[in-house]
Amino acid sequence: MHHIGMTQWIVGDEPLETSCRRLQACGYDGIEFAAEPDQLDADECLALMKRYDLNCRSLCGIFNEERDLTASGEKGEAAVLYLKKSVDFAEKVGAKIIIVVPSPVGRTVKPKELSMEELKENAVRNIRKAADYAWSKGISLALEAINRYETYFANTMTKVYELAQRIDHPGVGVMADLFHMSIEEANIPSSLYMVRDRLLHVHIADNTREAAGMGHTDFASALRMLDNIGYQGSLTMEFMYRLADPYSASEISTQTGLMDHYAKQAIDFIRMTERSLLAAE
């Protein structure tokens, strides 16, 4: 059975204690905090994790126009600084992985003034700088492929894997988000196998972006492949409302009852799938 967590940024303005209480009640192992070091208090996070018997294995980076790793100059340096501050926060709460989206979420058209090769060069340079700092503290960066309707850069597992290979850093790997993969990958298990040597983390949501089991994603085949490749990391739930801009989820008033339902649905479905796979061995 995998360690199962839930990412925190999706619950909008909900008090952190409400989120932690829900996770304990539903049987979760951990919480994935947003990488927002200026908004979250590490001591409060630690106290709540202790109170509700949770841990934190990862942070979810939030990458907007002000945190653009494909940029050069001051803008690129600002993105690196954001990641370094996130590393410091991760160290305080015990997280060993930070999820990194190389380009701003919401920008779906390539900047006209730069070629794709220049954008890649900027991303490689900036991520490598951040990775040097993170790795010195035992923290890894996991690059995430985001679907083409949310960003123009590194949309597939092949592209994000190639970027990680080009960065060529021991502290840089990739993560797999099954929602984005349901849009971009022809075969989810095959894509997981392809990135097996660099796979650090997994996000779980159905093809509708709701909780696992509410759409048509074949989670059994994905989990079977994760077992086959020896994946030992977390499965972290990242379900949300059906929104055109995913980051707007962090700005809305949370419907606590719906989040309660999603959280229980997600973990119950994934645990049931895991048990079925074990029984079939």
Which residues are covered by each model-predicted region?
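Histidine-acidic metal/acid-base catalytic patches
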Residues: M1-I4, I10-Q24, G94-A95, T158-V172, ...
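Structural motif corresponding to the early beta-alpha repeats
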Residues: D29, A35-V124, Q232, T236-P246, ...
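Catalytic-core regions built around general acid/base machinery
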Residues: E44-D53, N126-A134, S191, S221-L226
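Active-site acidic/histidine proton-transfer and metal-coordination neighborhood
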Residues: E74-G173, G257-D260, D268
